[in-house]
Amino acid sequence: MAALDASASFDASAIAKAQDETLAEAERLNLLPAPEKTPFENKYAARKLLQERCEVLQAALPGAGTTTPWVRALLGECEAALGDIGYDVEEPHAADPCYARALAALAPGAEALDDSGDHGDEDASEEARIQAAAADEETAEDIAVASAARVRDAALVGAPKHARGAELGAAALRALNGAAVLWQGREQPRRAFRLLKAAEALERLPSLPGGAGFSADTLREAETKTIYYLAQVCASLGDGAASANYCAQTLERQLVGPAPSFDGVTPLDWAKNCVGLARFFVDQGAVLDAMSCCRAGVAAARLDGVDDDPDEPRGSVVADAHKCWAQAHASRAESFIATRRTVATCTEKDAH
């Protein structure tokens, strides 16, 4: 493992190389099989490595000069990884300050978000709810723009050819998503929602001038996590329609491509989730969304391996999907007939 002598002259290339090596080794340790008697042993080793790296970066700051923003951003990258480890080893009290420091470094403004207000409050007027929702959207956009600018500016003054702009952008998303999961677990869903909306806004920025240059794979992975978490948070906030929409997006992302990924969930489970979501959309009158979910459910149910579950054969899931498909068509037909009747009535009145 490359190390940096704090007393040596500042060497940005050496710092970049050590950052690469440290984070790669920490990731390797995180992915090792967990020992049965000491399940967090490898994660503790990764945490120690990252903590030592933070100490080295802190020691490098006094001599960083014009590259100070870059070194601070590298610190934020390490803190985001430390936050994830703190959460994984069931120490949210340790994860919290790490995420806060990562957000302050990479997504300024996000660390100050709180759980106040609720634009889903039934007692609030419609105008008040609309204004609160608009304020949340504006805040999310502001944080996203500030984050992209922070990452861009840090990369511009970093080590030549080793600025890590894409990695720093990914770390910002990692901190936003991780902090959101943390606060959702602490029963502060509004705070989690605001963090996730900031992540969602940041993920839309790469195509805009000045956006952080994420790789396609990094961006897609982060987007899927954000959408998945938003589905849960919106459900906690009582926004069933938004939760269903994010669920549908999550399912779609898991099912597309030549090699569908279910993240440990069996294809049969995903098929049942799709059909359940389709029923919700039928009840809401969202017929096209219901049909899309039915198609996804059938596709998942027909993947190899689902017949291994004797208690829930794929045939019954496919049948449920077809039944829901029929209900969606019936709902669509009823809507069409009702519209025709309304038009006919209006035409008749106009004729008289």
Language-model regions, residue ranges each:
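Residues that mark the junctions of alpha-helical repeat units in TPR/alpha-solenoid scaffolds
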Residues: 18, 46, 68, 75, ...
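"A position-specific structural signal for the A-helix of alpha-solenoid helical repeats
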Residues: 20, 24, 74-77, 81, ...
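N-terminal alpha-helical scaffolding segments that mark the starts
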Residues: 1-56, 73
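Amphipathic alpha-helical segments of tetratricopeptide repeats
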Residues: 54-62, 103-111, 160, 200-211, ...
